Amino acid sequence: MHRRLSFAVLLGLIIVLPLVAGGEKKLVLKVLVPEADAEIIVNGKTIEGEGTERKIEVEAAAKGQKVHIVTASWEPNNYTKFTRTRKVPIDSKGPVTVDLTKAYDTEKIKIRYVPTPDDVVAKMCQLGKVTKKDTVYDIGCGDGRMVIHAVEKFAAKRGVGIDLDEVRIKESKENAKKHKVEEKVEFRVGDALDIKDLSDASVVLLYMGDDVNLRLRPILQKTLKPGSRIVSHRFLMGDWKPQRTETFTGDDGDEYSIHLWVIGKKRKD
């Protein structure tokens, strides 16, 4: 009798255990990314694979975890790295589509630092017709050379440089002191995508990449005053065509292009 009971209990365990083990289903995510070679990280783990649409099975959530965190990073060019993150609730019923092809407020863009040669900076200031009446902004200012040059060589009234990298901002401030223009320039840490108002600027200098220029475009068009000038080294702004483009050979023998946009009169709706 005892042996029969033990066998029955054992048989019950054999039947129940697979049900328990198989009862915890993995969540299936369909992740959409803008680039086939984008890196995808789910809950801190890199997921191998390629393609703009990927099917990913998510492991069971850790204790206390309320969301699955899905991050994608990619580099559309040698200058720019995009990172986008989405959160998927733990109790979601799969499959869940995670669309990382669209930009949201959580998007981060990192620009590789490549300084603009001094002679190109001078050409940009000339194209933008910088004068003593101007307040010049450089978004993604790096070592600060653009606004320093605008103030020192073109007598701009004021210069403002913004960069995400604290090290570059520190370097910019040191360079301003070396050139003895620290009283006329301001450098601050900031994300280009967080800028909401550029109405203080009369000239904006850029070397940021096509993607970032395109995201800045609505702010530039909406907040800059009529007559304000935008000068971009190399990169454009989608279908907003520049009024003028200059191509020239730099002191280093390389060819450079700079583009000018002038803000027109605002329409009254």
Where are these regions (language model features)?
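Conserved SAM-binding motif I beta-strand of class I
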Residues: 158-163
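C-terminal substrate-binding/active-site "lid" region of AdoMet-derived donor-dependent transferases
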Residues: 211-269
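Conserved SAM-binding loop of SAM-dependent methyltransferases across substrates and taxa
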Residues: 145-156
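A short SAM/SAH-binding and catalytic strip from SAM-dependent methyltransferases
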Residues: 201-215
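Glycine-rich helix-loop-beta junction characteristic of Rossmann-like nucleotide cofactor-binding loops
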Residues: 126-132, 196-197
